[in-house]
């Protein structure tokens, strides 16, 4: 019997597998596709040409994870992205932005002297908020959804963990000081009004708005898009704070390095295997059933699939509390 079966060999699943294996757990990772990585893969779409087919840049990978998994030892290399963006204009001018602040100001001054002066202040505001909030990324979030007492036992250890998390969040908010209003707007609001307040040139606002809506079908006027502006200055996987980078060999090289690290820690990884159901007996995880009909016994399951797949397709309806199932059904990924 396994201590944990992880559904999906995406980069999050591989990190989870490594962490559990380092604690002495017997871990099995099951991946539906024939290659690991999930959305972090390199594939040969045309003969002789390999590309990152989903995720294409790295920055938010935590340095702690990189060090613990010894990813460089397993072939992980990052090439800093410079320039970071190129925006052509309709009048023959263009905007080229990169990691050098003075060069950015020179570029922006083509379109607005005021915007060139504002840009360092805008970056500093994002930096301060990001630095205060980044420690929260390493904290286990508390359970905010009310659940029946019969579904999960809440012991002293969990209460202590939630209290500790709340304390760290309080400390982060305290350090925000007078930028708390801006932080709240960045975490919950749309990007467009923020950019409109800071800048006047459309080409700069359009370039920065890309950071807010990348990978979504939302306009920059949609609530929640402002948060992604913070990603522009968060992370340091590119070699310095806020620097994004390309992985040598494509994003799949990162997943391959993670898989190699996980295997070195004792993790078993099987590809080309689809999980059809998470088996539950007496309100406890008992195993998983594969598409082949085979069942694998395990004490726990960690799913790298999304919430809809995990709770609506892999677990029979009615197994979980109705309030939880309704909350999952309302999740909108668009």
Regions found by a protein language model. Give the residues of each.
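N-terminal glycine-rich phosphate/pyrophosphate-binding loop and immediately adjacent elements
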Residues: 2-153
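Conserved acidic residues
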Residues: 3, 286, 299
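Conserved SAM/SAH-binding loop
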Residues: 11, 272-276, 292-293
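General beta-strand structural signal in soluble alpha/beta enzymes
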Residues: 29-31, 206-208, 271, 298, ...
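Flexible loop/turn segments at secondary-structure boundaries
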Residues: 35-39, 214-217, 277-279, 308-312
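Active-site/ligand-binding neighborhood in enzyme catalytic cores
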Residues: 127-265
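Glycine-rich loop(s) and the adjacent beta-strand/alpha-helix scaffold that form part
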Residues: 244-260, 264-265, 278-279, 289-334
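A conserved short coil-to-beta-strand element within the FAD-binding core of flavoproteins
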Residues: 268-286
């Amino acid at each position: 019997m396994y201590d944990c079966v992880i559904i999906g060999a995406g980069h999050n699943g591989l990190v989870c597998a490594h962490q559990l294996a380092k604690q002495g757990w017997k871990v099995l990772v099951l991946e539906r596709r024939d290659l690991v990585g999930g959305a972090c893969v390199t594939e040969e779409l045309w003969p002789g040409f390999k590309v990152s087919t989903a995720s294409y840049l790295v920055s938010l990978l935590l340095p702690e994870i990189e060090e613990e998994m010894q990813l460089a030892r397993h072939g992980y290399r990052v090439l800093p992205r410079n320039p970071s963006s190129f925006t052509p204009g309709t009048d023959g001018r263009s905007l080229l932005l990169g990691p050098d602040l003075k060069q950015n100001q020179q570029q922006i001054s083509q379109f607005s002297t005021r915007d060139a002066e504002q840009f360092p202040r805008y970056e500093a505001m994002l930096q301060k908020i990001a630095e205060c909030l980044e420690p929260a990324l390493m904290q286990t979030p508390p359970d905010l959804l009310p659940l029946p007492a019969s579904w999960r036992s809440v012991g002293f250890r969990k209460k202590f963990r939630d209290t500790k998390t709340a304390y760290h969040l309080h400390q982060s908010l305290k350090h925000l000081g007078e930028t708390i209003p801006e932080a709240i707007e960045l975490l919950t609001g749309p990007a467009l009004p923020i950019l409109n307040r800071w800048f006047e040139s459309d080409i700069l606002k359009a370039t920065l708005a890309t950071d807010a809506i990348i990978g979504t079908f939302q306009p920059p006027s949609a609530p929640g898009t402002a948060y992604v502006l913070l990603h522009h200055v968060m992370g340091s996987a590119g070699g310095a704070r806020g620097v994004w980078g390309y992985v040598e060999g494509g994003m799949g090289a990162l997943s391959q390095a993670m898989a190699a690290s996980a295997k070195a820690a004792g993790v078993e990884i099987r590809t080309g295997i689809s999980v059809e159901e998470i088996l539950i007996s007496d309100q406890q995880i008992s195993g998983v059933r594969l598409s082949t009909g085979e069942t694998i016994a395990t004490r726990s399951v960690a799913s790298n699939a999304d919430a809809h797949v995990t709770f609506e397709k892999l677990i029979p309806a009615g197994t979980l509390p109705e309030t939880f199932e309704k909350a999952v059904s309302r999740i909108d990924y668009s």
